[in-house]
Amino acid sequence: MATSRDRLGTLEAEGSSGRQGYSGVEVVLSSDPATPAPLCPHELGPTLLFVKVNQGKEETRRFYACSACRDRKDCNFFQWEDEKLSGARLAAREAHNRSCQPPLSRSQCVERYLKFIELPLSQRKFCQSCQQLLLPDDEEKHHEHQVVGDVSITQLKRPSKLLYPLENKKTNAQYLFADRSCLFLVDLLSNLGFRRVLCVGTPRLHELIRLKESGGTKSNIRSLLLDIDFRYSQFYMEDSFCHYNMFNHHFFDGKAALEVCKTFLQEDKGEGVIMVTDPPFGGLVEPLAVTFKKLIAMWKEGHSQDNSQKELPIFWIFPYFFESRICQFFPSFCMLDYQVVDYDNHALYKHGKTGRKQSPVRIFTNIPPNKIILPIEEGYRFCPLCQRYVSLENQHCEHCNSCTSKDGRKWNHCFLCKKCVKPSWIHCSICNHCALPDHSCKGPKDGCFICGELDHKRSACPNISTSKKVNKAVRKQKQRKSNKMKMETTKGQSMNHTSATRKKKRRERTHQYLCS
């Protein structure tokens, strides 16, 4: 699920920095389990706990917000962690949440699907306006809508071709793999010997695996799709699709869907399964990592203690500039040089002159890179020194002892920085590191918000308790000033009122005297 060019600069800054961008908002991963998170209005499951940080100048205060939406226009849910809600407000929120749920339950969708495939071709219709398969009884309600007729079984097996992509870049970012990218992944998974694929946010890959399985081609791979788009519920049985939010590990259909996923992962004692995920690039790495670790723990439950050191194989498709953040949570991961460029409905990430070299999309995996063969015909070669496939432009650096390029271009070695850098970067003597020629030397720096050191974050700062005390004192002082100003304003207004009353009475006495 890719994102647009106008977001890449922001995302690269966030990915390469030591914190969540420069907005001063961080995810709180360890919330109190005894206090369940509230649900956001559009029913994407439990919210996440965040904290605002302003370089240690103000006391931090936690708040709940939507797990999937980074834009308040998409989901305006906001609640302070310590905020006490009235019973009336809680009841109103619950009623609103119920009104925002999908119109059909999971069992109703399955029941309708079974009826739909039994219909003759002439009666199989799909409403593009409502994004819904229509049964004969539904046609009257949709007679003014844009309806597609003669929906074939082949079309039903490719629902992503029927459904309009959800292209909200910060929430769904549903940019779909082209068949070319999917075929490469399917062939790679097959060559690696996997028999089951857990597709987390990869509906096109799920479709192609199922097509190969049912099409008589040599494929013994099965797949299960976990996706936040509830529209897929009307095309799959319960054992093929689970409505799921990867940002908070929430199964919308409860324990039944959870058991489907668990059974799929633990089949054959967990052997022969891999997870492939393509999250929205605007999503936060931290909650995704927490979710994936929960899926890994679910997979490990089916293992014996002898295999406790094994890892669930994973392909995480994400921009290369998030490498350090991903490896922070998964140290065993490495980034492949393969550039995922083919997204059907994306203007930039397509194969051709404007495609591959501009794509930041890579595959992060815990599978040894020497086992993964990349296509030579697409411009990849095997580096015998690194023991992995790399792009042709990615030259081996004898000083770094590695093929160092991340973006497909030839990088240059900087002897002052003691590492390879992008060809467009130069060494800045003021900043003492390489950067773009027109960079600002006074720009924001990585490291701790409180003390400025680079070796730790704000949450691990030894001065955090002192900072909190100072912030608390500053906050109290501000509160006292505010209260004093209010009192002075009130007092001034009272004195002005008394003075005006006295003047009025004086005028009245003078008037009476003159008239007498």
Swiss-Prot record:
One Gene Ontology biological process: rRNA methylation
UniProt-annotated binding residues for Zn(2+) 2: 127, 130, 142, 145
Binding site for Zn(2+) 1: 40, 42, 66, 75
Bias type Basic residues, positions: 472-484, 500-509
Domain DHHC: 398-448
Ligand binding (Zn(2+) 5): 414, 417, 427, 434
Region annotation Disordered: where it falls in the sequence: 472-516
Subunit structure: Interacts with components of the ASC-1 complex TRIP4, ASCC1, ASCC2 and ASCC3. Interact with AHCYL1 and AHCYL2. Interact with YTHDC2.
Protein name per UniProt: rRNA N(6)-adenosine-methyltransferase ZCCHC4
Taxon lineage: Eukaryota, Metazoa, Chordata, Craniata, Vertebrata
